[in-house]
Amino acid sequence: MIRMKNVSKVYRTEHVETHALSSFTVDIGAAEFVAIMGPSGSGKTTFLNIAGLLDTFDQGSYWLDGQDVSRLSDRQMSRLRNEKIGFIFQSFNLIPDLDVFDNVDVPLRYRGLPGKHRRELIEEALAVVGLTARLRHYPAQLSGGQQQRVAVARALVGRPRLMLADEPTGNLDSAMANEIMDLLERINGAGTTVVMVTHDPELAARAPRQIHVLDGHLLDLAAEVPAPLFRPGAPTPEPAFGG
């Protein structure tokens, strides 16, 4: 599903260069559930943005679902993003003036689907997250957990092959966080690839595969990296690969 090889990304200002990713290499297969961890500024959000076609890269190659991203026009990239990828954000990113139904409808409108088909997809997505009875409520009338479930439904409504979640439980209490994790596991169990950024090691442990991003490099925990390397204040370990 995701295949990056030697991807590098540098952010430049007038006097400063920040290397967000350096020779970053990763393969994430179809229907995997992967948790991405790392300290602030490590490059994990940059990786997620590039994976989601929200940002470009300077060097390397990226293949998404068998397509070479570097060969796509902006229009082709937008279409691929809309049809293949669902996004979940920490801050929900719901439109306050739209009710639940219309918030979930937003990505479908860009596809030009007929209204009847859109309604079927929206009702299906809201049923998955348990919010069918709330479709005419507005975000301000919902709890934080309910708002995030709306965000999950919006990400799910287009039946994407890839779900990218950036700190999806960051604004929720532990009970609500576990509900969102349950939803992500159900979505993954239905065959959708899920890639989740989180700071919470307990939530990350629910993913079958965990990856650490440190100083723009990748460490795959399947490589049996010693636990002391991840203790607060420990020296930055050498990357297992991609460095």
Task: Provide a role label for each language-model segment.
Residues M1-V213:
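ABC family nucleotide-binding domain
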Residues H217-G243:
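Conserved beta-strand-loop-alpha-helix hinge in the C-terminal portion
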